[in-house]
Regions:
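The feature captures the beta-strand-to-loop junction immediately N-terminal to the Walker
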Residues: 33-35
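Helix-to-loop junction immediately C-terminal to a conserved catalytic motif
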Residues: 48
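Conserved ABC transporter NBD signature motif
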Residues: 56-64
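Conserved ABC ATPase "signature" region
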Residues: 63-64, 111-129
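ABC ATPase NBD coupling module
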Residues: 65-81, 105, 111-112
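Short coil-to-helix segment of the ABC ATPase nucleotide-binding domain corresponding to the Q-loop/switch region
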Residues: 93-101
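Conserved ABC ATPase signature
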Residues: 134-138, 142
Length: 149
């Protein structure tokens, strides 16, 4: 569960978030909507730890993100993800290679294990048949599912 309490975020004199409180329960889908420039992205970046609040708290299962050790933050971030408005895929890599990219960079798996893991992820989002295609060959919705995988 993620809970935010009295969250405020400012950039210099500009207050972007003011006294926001909310609870995001595990297993539930939440929607954050608002006008352009209303602070949605700043809020989400605070939720996933890409920004730290000016004041207030962001709690993960009751633990304050700001007071976590670097290792605790790394472990917490492994449990969450964020998909940007554009899917942020590499145009020069196939769907499979895009999914494998973080494994290539940050895991000690061998090539066979990385391919297998990436194919499992693609299967979960019903894109196993698109693994050899490139981002410009699939729909925007499919690109988002690649980003999820």
């Amino acid at each position: 569960m993620i809970e935010i309490k009295h969250l405020c975020k400012s950039f210099g004199d500009k207050e972007v978030l003011k006294d926001i409180s909310a609870v995001f329960e595990n297993g539930k889908t939440n929607l954050i909507i608002g006008q352009s420039g209303s602070g949605k992205t700043v809020l989400v970046k605070n939720l996933v730890g890409l920004l730290e609040p000016t004041s207030g708290e962001v709690l993960y299962d009751g633990r304050n993100f700001v007071t976590m050790t670097k290792q605790e933050k790394v472990m917490m971030r492994r449990e969450m993800g964020m998909i940007f408005q554009s899917a942020a895929l590499f145009d020069s890599l196939s769907v499979l290679e895009n999914v494998m990219f973080p494994l290539d960079m940050f895991s000690s798996m061998n090539l066979k294990e990385r391919i297998h893991r990436a194919q499992e992820c693609l299967d979960r989002v019903n894109l196993i048949d698109a693994q050899k295609k490139y981002p410009d060959e699939i729909s925007g919705g499919m690109q988002k599912r690649v980003a999820i995988a």
